Structure formats: C-alpha cells, structure tokens
C-alpha cells in the first residue's frame, strides 16, 4: 500500500477507523508523537486538500520511524516490481535500478506538490535519508536525491558511540546494600557526523544529584548529552544496569 496507492487499502483503513475524518485524526495524533511539527492530514489518500500538508523534514522523520521501528516490513520498499491481480507494476523509485545502496522509500506526485521522493540508502554502517519535494519531473527528483545521497556519503560517516549495556560510569548509592550502581544505555547509540570529526565530540553525563536505594535495573538515573561544535547530537536517558 505504501508503494502503490490502492483504493481498496484506503477504504479498509477508513472503515477500521470509523470514517475518513477519524482516520485523519489518528494520523495527526501519530504525527505529533513522531515530532512531525509541520504536518497535518485531512484524508487517507494524500490527495490535495486545503489543510493537508507536510514538510521535507517531517517526511524524513516518518521515514526514519519506518526504518527503525518496522524493520520486518521495510524490505517491501526495495521491491522493484509488485504483482497484484495478475498485473505487474514497477516501483516508481527509479533509484532502485541505478544505485544498489538505495532500498526505499516512497515517491509521490500531484500537480500542486510536484514530483516528490523520500529515499534511503545504506553504505557500510551509514544510512542516509534524502527528501525532495516540488521537482519538475520524475527524472529531476531522482537526480536531486542522488546528488544528496552521494554528497552525504562522501562527507559524513556514522559512528557508534555507546553500546547497549555498556557501563558509562558508576555512581554512589545511598541507603542500599551496594555502594555503587552502574549506569549505561539501554540500546546502541549512533551519530552521523562530518568525516574526521569524532575526536571533537564532547560527551557529558548528568546524573541525579542524590541516588537513593531501592534501585532496579532500568531505572532512569540521569541523561547523557553528546555535543559537536555547540550542537547537541544526542540527549538520551541513562539507566541503571
């Protein structure tokens, strides 16, 4: 349904939500949860409507959510063809044929929006998402996204800063059987940074001023921030290990 606009799928989702307006409300709620600050849905089709809009940054956020939270479904976006009811339809993302590192994600076109594309590619440990909106043709959108991807892979790299379960530090515990508790991250933390800039990263762990027992594994005890040239790249909770 994400690659080809099947009316049947739209009708099913609208039916499950109790109508198109309630379905749009659900989409707006989810968009808010994802931090999509410049997006508002009015329908399930994506067709133009007065108060139906999004931004390139918000579409990137949505793409990132799909890639990270639904890896079991993400492979569908790399399929070059889809057959339904004995009709074989090509994926309109032409970059799938041009660049082996591209594995998604979604094209779009209306007269008002122009030719749009949200694409993702992975080379080595680095995954990038590139978005264009309002281009003049399907070829133009492919070329512009390819330029952005090539630029990104040339000048940026992805580094793993923290491993899941890795001890960042130990902190004093008051009133417990143990004097200290180890703190760390619940999952791997990656950043994409300009090549050669890892040594310039600054990490700061801010723990609660007083940590009192009882403490169980997974309790949030503070936050870790990673800064590069004054910009905060990571701001995540640190937990008891």
Where are the predicted features?
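Domain-terminus/edge residues, biased toward the C-terminal soluble/receptor-binding domains
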Residues: 48-53, 57-241
């Amino acid at each position: 349904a994400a690659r080809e606009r099947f009316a049947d799928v739209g009708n099913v989702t609208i039916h499950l939500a109790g109508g198109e307006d309630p379905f749009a409300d659900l989409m707006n709620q989810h968009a808010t949860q994802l931090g999509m600050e410049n997006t508002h849905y009015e329908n399930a089709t994506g067709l133009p409507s007065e108060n139906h809009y999004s931004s390139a940054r918000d579409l990137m956020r949505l793409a990132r959510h799909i890639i990270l939270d639904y890896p079991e479904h993400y492979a569908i976006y790399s399929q070059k063809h889809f057959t339904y009811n004995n009709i074989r339809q090509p994926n309109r993302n032409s970059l799938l044929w041009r660049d082996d590192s591209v594995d998604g994600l979604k094209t779009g076109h209306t007269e008002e929006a122009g030719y749009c594309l949200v694409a993702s590619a992975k080379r080595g440990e680095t995954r990038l998402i590139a978005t264009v909106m309002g281009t003049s043709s399907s070829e133009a959108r492919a070329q512009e996204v390819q330029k952005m991807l090539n630029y990104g892979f040339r000048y940026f790299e992805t580094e793993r800063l923290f491993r899941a379960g890795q001890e960042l530090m130990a902190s004093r515990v008051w009133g417990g059987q143990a004097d200290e508790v180890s703190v760390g991250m619940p999952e791997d933390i990656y950043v994409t940074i300009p090549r050669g800039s890892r040594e310039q990263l600054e990490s700061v762990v801010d723990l609660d001023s007083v940590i009192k027992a009882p403490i169980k594994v997974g309790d949030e005890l503070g936050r870790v921030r990673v800064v590069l040239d004054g910009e905060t790249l990571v701001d995540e909770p640190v937990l008891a290990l």
